[in-house]
Amino acid sequence: RLEQAGADVVGLNCIRGPETMLPMIAEIREAVDCHVAALPVPYRTTDAEPSFQSLTDPHRPGHRPFPTSLDPFMCTREEIAEFGAAAWDLGARYLGVCCGAGAHHIRALALALGREPAGARYVPDMSRHAFLGTDAQLKDHNRDYASEL
């Protein structure tokens, strides 16, 4: 109905995280011919707890994490990048991240879509990581330690 009423873009913004928003984006893409938007919150919502307001923390019974204690539910930059690629593959073209997103989330989303944002220069060079890197200049005892992690 939104498209018939003149909407240029139909989609979802906020409330749901990537995992619980993606199936709905697929349904929207099937239902409309216009552009589709997908802007999840960067939190690990589930089928049992589909919105970031409904998340519960097993480490703090009786305490609701929303709105100020959502830290343990934060998506990684890789999860946001995977969401962006999957949403793009579904045909969503208006993509972003809503409440709680950090610069690293936005940068990861842009990079996953083949963009080259100015912030790309801040992507960590993991080849130089003291324990996990592959650079020949790294100390062997550090790399040996990594195999014991």
Which stretches of residues belong to each language-model region?
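Domain-level signal for soluble alpha/beta catalytic cores
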Residues: 1-149
